[in-house]
Design a protein with these regions (language model features):
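Non-catalytic alpha/beta scaffold blocks inside enzyme catalytic domains
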Residues: 1-181
């Protein structure tokens, strides 16, 4: 059985002003707390749980936790299974047993909840192989909407990446847990 999600904080104490800069460097930490029902945890807590062998497998989504702390980087080498969703190569993917390439924020639809609790919608700026830039045809450019595979402007490189939620849904389907969105 898996435990509840473990939400790490990325706080740099003292690096804050009264206008824009926050100590918490994670753009969607409030959204992660609201979705998971968990409070933010420090990397030290994760480090202790792995050392005590209370965590044998770790599933990391779109985060580079090995870069947070040198001690955490070392202890991740001893974990039995490390699975990572990542948008690019980093210290955590280097240690991972399984890596899933996931879409960047510029390749997917979604929302983020800022530190004030305001929901901010993100829309893709780059088309991937499986998804156009809009959920509906209303917001598509004429090039996107009317272009065919024979048009030169449609021949640009499209990457084969999926949003993390689709990767999780595909994994669950492989384990006979049927979910569809």
């Amino acid at each position: 059985n898996a435990e509840n999600p473990f939400v790490l904080n990325h706080v740099i104490p003292g690096d804050e002003d009264d206008i824009l800069i926050r100590e918490d460097k994670t753009p969607n930490s409030l959204g992660a707390v609201l979705c998971s029902g968990q409070e933010l945890n420090s990397p030290d807590k994760l480090l202790d749980l792995i050392k005590e062998k209370k965590i044998k497998a770790l599933y990391v989504m779109e985060d580079d936790i090995a870069s947070l702390d040198d001690k955490l980087n070392e202890v991740l080498k001893s974990i039995e299974v490390l699975i990572v969703h990542s948008t690019n190569y980093n210290k955590t993917t280097e240690l991972a047993h399984v890596v899933f390439g996931s879409s960047t924020y510029a390749e997917k639809h979604g929302t983020m909840v800022n530190f004030q609790g305001r929901i901010q919608r993100i829309r893709p700026a780059v088309a991937t192989e499986e998804m156009d830039r809009a959920l509906d045809g209303m917001k598509m450019s004429r090039w996107d909407k009317f272009g065919t595979k024979f048009d030169r402007w449609q021949q640009g490189k499209k990457f084969d990446s999926k949003p993390s939620w689709k990767i999780i849904a595909m994994l669950l389907n492989q384990f006979d847990v049927k979910i569809q969105y």
